[in-house]
Amino acid sequence: ILNRKRLIWNIFFMTPGIDDGNIIDSKKVDINEWDNCRTLYYKISIIVKQMYLENIPKILNNQVKCIKQIGEPSFYEKRTPEDGMIDWTKSFYEIFNLIRAVTHPYPGAFTYNGLEKIFIWDAQPFDTNICYPYSRNGEIVEIFDNNFVVNCSDGLLLITNHDAKKIYKKDILTSKII
């Protein structure tokens, strides 16, 4: 997700290198502020189906016009569960993007409240003007029903889907067991 506005998906011929074959087709999808890894998978599955339907006949009839890749191919390392650990000193938008990127079907973003490991599945940027000047990063400053607001370095994040057993105002969420 990484603050990007679009995702470009390529299909290409396989070569001995990593993702460096000639490009057969390329399509893009928007990444909007409501997307998460699951909705991006949905979008990708739609365009991949379209790309294969459009290009398999061309490949079988030797009518495909390939494009040579320019520059170094890029790829991301395999994601691990530890990648989901929330660092509450980051900006609320960076934390929001992390949660969006590692939600289902991935292992999820997580934090600790004392000894309890809490998985956070959904959140939204809440506000940058409301201040809690005496609150620490990661401190729960408000609770609404089963949602809670967390103080971050530059604003507030509303946690809307989590597996915490019990939370209290003034609880401090951390990146490690305390």
Regions found by a protein language model. Name each.
Residues 10, 21-22, 84, 116, ...:
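A generic secondary-structure signal marking the coil-to-beta-strand transition
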Residues 89-178:
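An anion-binding loop in the catalytic cleft
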Residues 57-112:
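Active-site-lining helix/loop region of Rossmann-like oxidoreductase modules
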Residues 44, 55, 78-79, 109, ...:
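Generic signature of intrinsically disordered, low-complexity segments enriched in small/polar residues
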Residues 28-31, 73-90, 123-133:
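Short, charged low-complexity intrinsically disordered segments located at boundaries
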Residues 1-75, 81-82:
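Donor/substrate-binding cores of folate-linked one-carbon enzymes
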